[in-house]
A protein has these predicted regions:
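Outer-membrane beta-barrel channels and translocator barrels
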Residues: 45, 89-93, 146-150, 216-218
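Bacterial Sec-dependent N-terminal signal peptides
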Residues: 1-26, 251-255
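Helix-adjacent hinge/juxtasegments
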Residues: 128-134, 141-144, 149-150
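Residues on the lipid-exposed face of transmembrane beta-strands in outer-membrane beta-barrel proteins
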Residues: 38-40, 56-58, 80-90, 100-102, ...
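Exposed, low-structure sequence patches enriched in small/polar residues
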Residues: 23, 148-162
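Short glycine/proline- and aromatic-enriched beta-strand/turn motifs that initiate or cap beta-hairpins
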Residues: 21-86
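Substrate-binding/catalytic groove segments of enzymes
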Residues: 217-222, 228-233
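Extracellular/periplasm-exposed beta-strand and loop segments of Gram-negative cell-envelope proteins
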Residues: 60-77, 105-135, 164-208, 230-246
Length: 255
C-alpha cells in the first residue's frame, strides 16, 4: 500500500512539473532593426601603404617675362613641356612630387628707339624673336580628395627651379644706319645672340600653385608659377629688374 502511494505521489509531482513548463512564456528575441537599414553605412577603415608613383607629363606652357626699368616690353613666350615625375605617397592623402621637365618656348616683341637720322621725332625698332630652352625641377606637396569611384580632386603647392639652357634672340633690325651705329656704341646688341650668356641669370626660382582632376592612371592639371628672383645679371641702373612667371596645363599618365 505504501508503494502504491509513493508511485501516485511521483506521478502527481511529474504532472505538476510538466504543467508549469507549459505555462512558462518563452523569452522573445529582439531583432536588430539596423540590419536592414539602407541608410546605415559600413565603416571601412582606410588602409594606406607607402609607395612611389611614376608619371610622364606633356602639355602647353606660357612664360611671361616682366621687365622693370628696361627698354624691353613685357614678352609672352608660348611652347611645350615634356618630362617625367615621381611622387612619394604619404599618409592622410598627401604626396611629395619631384622630377625633371624640359620646356621649349617661343616669343617676340618690338624694342623701339628714337631715330638718329630722321630730322623730326621718329622711332625705329628691333624685332626680337626669342627661342628659350630650359629644364625645370619641381618640388610639390600634393593633397588628394576622393570624389567618386576612381575620380579624385587634387591641389598642390611648392617651389620649382628653372635652369636656363639657352635663350637665343634671332632679332630683325628695322633701323637706319645712324641709329644702328649709335646703339652699338651704347652696347646694345644688334646681331643674334644668346641672352643667357651675358644678360640673364640661368637660375629662376619660382613658387607654384595649382590643381586638377585624376581618373585612375590619368591626370589633367594646371597651375601658375610666380618668379621670385631678379634675372638681370648686370643691372645698368638702380631698380633694373626682370622676373619670369608662367602658366601651364598638362596631361599626365601614371605607370
Amino acid at each position: 500500500m505504501q508503494r502504491i502511494a509513493y508511485i501516485v505521489l511521483c506521478l502527481c509531482l511529474g504532472a505538476v512539473s510538466l504543467w508549469a513548463q507549459d505555462k512558462e512564456k518563452p523569452a522573445l528575441q529582439i531583432a536588430d532593426n539596423t540590419f536592414f537599414d539602407p541608410t546605415k553605412k559600413e565603416v571601412v577603415e582606410e588602409k594606406y601603404q607607402f609607395g612611389v608613383e611614376y608619371r610622364v607629363e606633356a602639355g602647353y606652357v606660357q612664360h611671361w617675362q616682366r621687365p622693370h626699368d628696361i627698354s624691353f616690353r613685357d614678352m609672352y613666350l608660348h611652347g611645350v613641356r615634356l618630362g617625367a615625375t615621381f611622387t612619394f605617397k604619404l599618409p592622410l592623402r598627401f604626396g611629395l612630387e619631384t622630377g625633371l621637365l624640359y620646356t621649349l618656348v617661343y616669343g617676340r616683341n618690338d624694342q623701339h628707339w628714337r631715330s638718329m637720322d630722321a630730322p623730326s621725332v621718329q622711332t625705329e625698332y628691333i624685332q626680337h624673336r626669342v627661342l628659350e630652352h630650359n629644364l625645370t625641377v619641381p618640388v610639390r606637396a600634393y593633397y588628394t580628395i576622393p570624389l567618386w569611384k576612381k575620380l579624385n580632386l587634387f591641389f598642390y603647392a611648392g617651389p620649382q627651379l628653372h635652369i636656363g639652357l639657352a635663350e637665343n634672340d634671332y632679332m630683325q633690325l628695322h633701323l637706319s644706319e645712324g641709329t644702328k651705329n649709335w646703339l652699338e656704341t651704347q652696347g646694345v646688341p644688334t646681331e643674334p645672340y644668346d641672352r643667357m650668356a651675358d644678360e640673364l641669370i640661368r637660375a629662376n626660382i619660382q613658387m607654384g600653385l595649382g590643381g586638377g582632376l585624376e581618373w585612375d592612371c590619368y591626370r589633367l592639371q594646371s597651375g601658375y608659377d610666380f618668379g621670385l628672383n631678379n634675372l638681370v645679371k648686370h643691372p645698368q641702373a638702380k631698380g633694373q629688374y626682370m622676373s619670369e612667371w608662367g602658366w601651364f596645363v598638362s596631361f599626365c599618365y601614371r605607370f
